[in-house]
Amino acid sequence: MIAKKIISPFAKTDLSDASKWYEKQQKDLGKRFLNEMKEAFEIICQTPTSFPIRYDDYRIYYTKTFPYSIHYQYIDYKNEIQIKAVFHTARNPQIWEQRIF
């Protein structure tokens, strides 16, 4: 069964900021970024336990084209994923960790 997806306000801001930045770099690149994120969310929802646990019970999924990682929790008894961050892989991980710890 496909898991329900909840995107945190922080992750929504991450998505918005990144797509705007990519759109400024090249026309339609922001849209391509958002499309890849949508595909990634679908994959995570279909197979939420397939990706490694990185911190405590937070899992991480690395996108294919863009250098981003999606940090999420899978709540098994609710069959729900909670997306906490959409994070550029070159950024300091302590920034997103401060959101959850």
What are the roles of these predicted feature ranges?
Residues 13, 17, 39-42, 46:
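Generic recognition of well-ordered alpha-helical segments
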Residues 31, 52-54, 95:
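Short, hydrophobic secondary-structure boundary micro-motifs
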